[in-house]
Amino acid sequence: IAATGYVRVPAAAHQTAPPQGVDAWREGMSQRIAERVSGPSAPYLRALALGDTRALDDAAWATLRATGLSHLIAISGFHVGLVAAFFALLVAGVWRWQPRLGTLLPRLHAASIAALLGAAAYAVVAGLALPTVRTVLMIAVVALVRVLRRRASTAHILALALLAVLLWDPLSVLVAGFWLSFAGVTWLVWCLPSDDRAIVRGFLSAQTVATVGLLPLTVSLFGQASLVGPFANLVAIPWWTFVVVPLCLVGTALEAIYPGAGVWAWQLAGWCFELTWPGFVWLGRTTVALWWVPESDGVALIAALLGAFW
């Protein structure tokens, strides 16, 4: 249920109490980014750091849709997974550095719990948006399986995660992101080898598989597909994920500890973001950026999925 309200007599409105809680903290942090980061990158940093997309105008969203980057600009499951991996690796490194900790809690268990706690904390910072909650539930299933030392295949873990998401929010099946996220993960697990350690080749393979595999579903859900999206994602995913987003998070964490300490990280993140954004704007304005497809029926979707699978 969504609604928009307004105040009839603004002059008569008065604040009864100062804002409190996580939402008030997020609002204050978002305002700090807007005030202390100059240039056009501030709205995007607010979205990447806090999931606050209110400052993005129609032109920005049009560019993101045309280049297939909408899934990266706001806090998504991918970002939550990145934070979870960071905490897991950090705790695992501490356990390797201090082997005595393993007598209290096995390293694998500690890393799994740290990943879950880090993902949950980041989801709260993001305002508990549905994509972040969905990813936290997936991570919780994986952590539970590891802590309980249960042997489960990837298919079983995905099925349990799907069940957990539906128990949390049954109406999520009406959201396109639900189908795209689970279909994308399932497609990658099915098509990609699990023992491929070549990072560049694995990234290119994952990008190709995700693009081809999700193309029929994307066209069916939205009636359009970004033809330049694969090329834009080849640059945006590694650059934004491993440079811009970490700097945004470092700045937010430092700013939460001491006001003013995170400005340098935000400004550096803005500079790094602006290195790539003009190119994406140009790419989104090309005549071949978007492919519009008439509405299709279920038979066409099934045929397209079979073709992608083949």
Regions picked out by a protein language model, each given a short descriptive name:
Residues 5, 57-230, 294-310:
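Hydrophobic alpha-helical transmembrane segments in multi-pass membrane proteins
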Residues 23-34, 266, 270, 284-292:
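N-terminal transmembrane-helix/juxtamembrane module of multi-pass inner/ER membrane proteins
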Residues 11, 54-55, 120, 241, ...:
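Active-site/binding-pocket entry motifs
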Residues 185-288:
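Alpha-helical transmembrane segments of multi-pass integral membrane proteins
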Residues 1-71:
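Membrane-interface helix/helix-cap signal primarily in integral membrane proteins
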Residues 17, 21, 25, 40, ...:
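Catalytic cores of large soluble enzymes that bind and process phosphate-bearing ligands
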Residues 26, 30, 45, 49, ...:
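Hydrophobic face of alpha-helices
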Residues 24, 28, 43, 55, ...:
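Generic alpha-helical secondary structure signal
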